[in-house]
Design a protein with these regions (language model features):
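Beta1/beta-strand and adjacent pyrophosphate-binding region of the FAD-binding site
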Residues: 1-9
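Residues at the starts of beta-strands that form the adenosine-phosphate
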Residues: 2, 25, 216
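Conserved mid-domain beta->alpha element of the FAD-binding
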Residues: 8-21, 29, 173, 262-352, ...
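Conserved Rossmann-like nucleotide-cofactor binding loop
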Residues: 11, 34, 157
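Generic enzyme active-site microenvironment
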Residues: 28-29, 150, 194, 284
């Protein structure tokens, strides 16, 4: 088959890589002149790492990233611990990999280029035209095709996805900072501080960047999505003062932010395509399902989608392959979307009641067996099988 993949992000590179050893003719289209990542830090969970291993990208990713063995969160005023999820003992084989998007992108791109993946740059996809069961890609000023299959990995702003996602009231700003030698914070933990659910600040160790061997961290600050413009027009020192007031130990990190341009806005939405495919067109990653990053599953969902789709295309004829792909991922996506919808307002919302329930009901109950194991499996992405009927 002739297959077009739109979007050179995590999902696009992953599916191109996983199909590179087939007889299909694969072309990956990207809108930028040079493929490049967008964003700051993220966490690759153990299930995502297994996909990277299948792709031949895990070694580079592990060399760049930072192994995280615990997620820890405290209420800022009382110091009460309200989030504690452990992957396993420090130094063990079970961990989440904190990594910068640029580093993950480099690992994925290198692995894909080793397999001969072809990337067509400066090609902005605006739509498709279906004729005689084949798709022609509509590009800016030109067309490409026809293709037997178009894989939409264009992300949350995909022009090919019919999804209508609901904007979430809270987003965040993210920035990359150096890890200070003077800090007492652990480089093996994602740590957060909350003031009710309306303020959250956190620090995620993310390892090193391409061509920069100094240890880095992703600094993030939660805020209402409608406050972004107000924040940009407020002196940066006022924000720094408020951030340090929320968590004084982060002063060496926060003080590195000297201008608004060092922080990237992230706006989140929530939605899922009931059927992520149609005749000769299939959606993966954020083009198929979107949620808050509170559970740390965004990149993993794209990797898991890519693995399932590649498996099905290798074992079934096209129409059945798309149906089997949807079947294999449906339950996992549905449950994690529901969990994200339920938990996110406890950490990012204007509610006064939900953070009280979080601090005084959910946090204590989360320490009673079997709750710790359930929370760990939730974060790892394995609370239910990521691929129904498919081994990984």
């Amino acid at each position: 088959m002739k297959i077009a993949i739109t979007g050179c992000g995590i999902g696009g590179l992953a599916i191109a890589n996983l199909l590179a050893d087939t007889d299909h003719e694969i072309t990956l289209y990207d809108q930028f002149d040079t493929p490049a990542p967008v964003g700051s830090g993220l966490v690759i969970q153990p299930v995502g790492l297994r996909v990277l291993e299948k792709m031949g990208a895990a070694e580079d990713a592990l060399a760049y990233g930072a192994a995280g063995y615990q997620m820890l969160g405290h209420e800022s005023h009382t110091g009460r611990k309200v989030l504690d999820v452990s992957y396993g003992p420090n130094g063990g084989n079970s961990f989440g990999l904190g990594i910068h998007r640029a580093s993950l992108f480099e690992a994925l791109l290198n692995a894909s280029q080793r397999k001969g993946v072809s990337i067509t740059t400066a090609s902005r996809v605006t739509g498709t035209t279906l004729l005689n069961r084949k798709h022609t890609l509509d590009l800016t000023g030109k067309t490409a095709g026809p293709f037997d299959l178009v894989i939409d990995a264009s992300g949350a702003k995909s022009p090919l996805s019919p999804m209508t996602a609901k904007p979430l009231p809270y987003g965040a700003i993210w920035g990359t900072v150096d890890w200070p030698e003077t800090t007492s914070l652990s480089y093996s933990r994602l740590q957060q501080r909350y003031r009710r659910a309306s303020n959250m600040i956190g620090i995620l160790p993310i390892g090193t960047l391409p061509n920069d061997n100094s240890p880095k961290a992703a600094l993030f600050w939660s805020m209402p999505r409608n406050d972004f413009t107000l924040w940009e027009n407020t002196p940066i020192d006022e924000w720094r003062k408020g951030a340090i007031g929320l968590w004084s130990e982060l002063a060496p990190f926060v003080e590195q932010i000297q201008s608004h341009s060092q922080m990237t806005h992230a706006r989140y939405s929530h939605g899922t395509l009931r059927k992520p495919y149609s005749q000769g067109l299939v959606h993966i990653g954020d083009a198929a399902h979107r949620a808050s990053p509170q559970l740390g599953q965004g990149a993993n969902m794209a990797l898991l989608d890519a693995y399932a789709l590649a498996h099905c295309l290798k074992h079934y004829a096209l129409e059945q392959a798309l149906a089997e792909y949807h079947k294999s991922r449906k339950r996992h996506v549905k449950i994690y979307q529901a969990m994200s919808w339920m938990f996110t307002p406890m950490y990012q919302s204007d509610s006064r009641i939900l953070p009280i329930l979080r601090d005084w009901l959910l946090a204590p109950s989360s320490t009673v067996p079997p709750a710790p194991k359930i929370l760990t499996s939730l974060v790892k992405g394995t609370m239910v099988s990521p691929h129904r009927g498919i081994d990984i």
